[in-house]
């Protein structure tokens, strides 16, 4: 019996551990050959072995996804080993948490680089390949699944760098969805909540329970990602899904709210009353994670 992603070639970044590893194994279980990308070569090789033990196909790749050449080589790994590319799952990332007044430039740059540029660079090179395929008359059924976060959608105290990068990923997702649809590419994002090396040292609530359903297991996130990577999901693009445990939710995102139109330029002295009116008519924003 064929799997949901049978023979669909998948690249997963940051796949040596945690959520990325779970994605790689879940795709392999559904028949997909997988490129397991991680800068930790031993971790990537270990996941390849796990995939092969399941009877699947996988190769390891240690490219730095935030490096322009490395990202191009990553896409090349899929094409050279499996002859095609169907799905890109951008997952790689890490944390450098600080309150804003303590956040250093290097900590800002490192997090924005690996998350935001580390999404853009592989996406850019994959998109170039898919555009060429479409122009040659071989329109793909290609899928991109990016990884945003609740921190990117609502903000998270102590994570200004991470929140900004993840918000940027959500913005990149909707733009890429609009631009790449003509080439047969859908682009969506997930905002997962799961236990990883990044989170378990910080959030005690994510610890594995002694019994019962492990709501924070990273494997809970992967079924949605696999479905989004399948041919079945072609009607879904430009969306951000929150996924945690057994819950899947659609994030609503920014929307136009109450407005006042004057028909001419405002005087600054008038705007206090205008803003008060707008705030009274608007719903309260959802709280920033960690805010008192």
Model segments located where?
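Canonical Rossmann dinucleotide-binding motif of NAD(H)/NADP(H)-dependent dehydrogenases/reductases
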Residues: 2-35
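A glycine-rich helix->loop->beta "capping" turn
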Residues: 5-6, 54-57, 77-88, 96, ...
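Substrate-binding pocket helix/loop in short-chain dehydrogenase/reductase
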Residues: 99-100, 104-112
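The beta1-alpha1 cofactor-binding region of Rossmann-like NAD(H)/NADP(H)-dependent oxidoreductases
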Residues: 41-42, 62-75, 105
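C-terminal helical subdomain
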Residues: 189, 210-292
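Residue(s) in the substrate-gating loop at a strand-loop-helix junction
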Residues: 149
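Active-site helix of classical SDR
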Residues: 123, 165, 173
């Amino acid at each position: 019996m064929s799997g949901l992603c049978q023979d669909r070639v998948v690249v997963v970044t940051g796949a040596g551990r945690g959520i990325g590893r779970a994605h790689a194994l879940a795709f392999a279980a559904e028949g997909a050959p997988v490129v397991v990308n991680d800068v930790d070569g031993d971790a990537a090789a270990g996941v390849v072995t796990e995939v092969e033990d399941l009877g699947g196909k996988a190769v390891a790749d240690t490219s730095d996804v935030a490096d322009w050449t490395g990202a191009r080589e990553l896409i090349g790994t899929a094409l050279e080993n499996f002859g095609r590319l169907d799905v890109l799952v951008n997952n790689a990332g890490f944390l450098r948490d600080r309150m804003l007044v303590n956040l250093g430039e290097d900590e800002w740059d490192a997090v924005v680089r690996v998350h935001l540029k580390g999404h853009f660079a592989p996406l850019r090179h994959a998109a170039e390949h898919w555009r060429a395929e479409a122009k040659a008359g071989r329109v793909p059924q290609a899928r991109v699944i990016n990884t945003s976060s609740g921190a990117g959608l609502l903000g998270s105290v102590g994570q200004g760098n991470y929140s900004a990068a993840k918000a940027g990923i959500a913005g990149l997702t909707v733009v890429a969805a609009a631009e790449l649809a003509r080439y047969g590419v859908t682009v969506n994002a997930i905002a997962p909540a799961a236990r990883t090396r990044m989170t378990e040292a910080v959030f005690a609530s994510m610890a594995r329970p002694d019994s019962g359903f492990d709501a924070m297991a990273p494997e809970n996130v992967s079924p949605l990602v696999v479905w989004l990577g399948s041919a079945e999901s072609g009607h879904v693009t430009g969306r951000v899904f929150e996924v945690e445990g057994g819950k899947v939710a659609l994030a609503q995102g920014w929307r136009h709210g109450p407005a006042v139109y004057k028909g001419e330029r405002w005087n600054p002295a008038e705007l206090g009353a205008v803003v008060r009116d707008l705030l009274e008519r608007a719903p309260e924003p959802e709280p920033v994670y960690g805010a008192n």
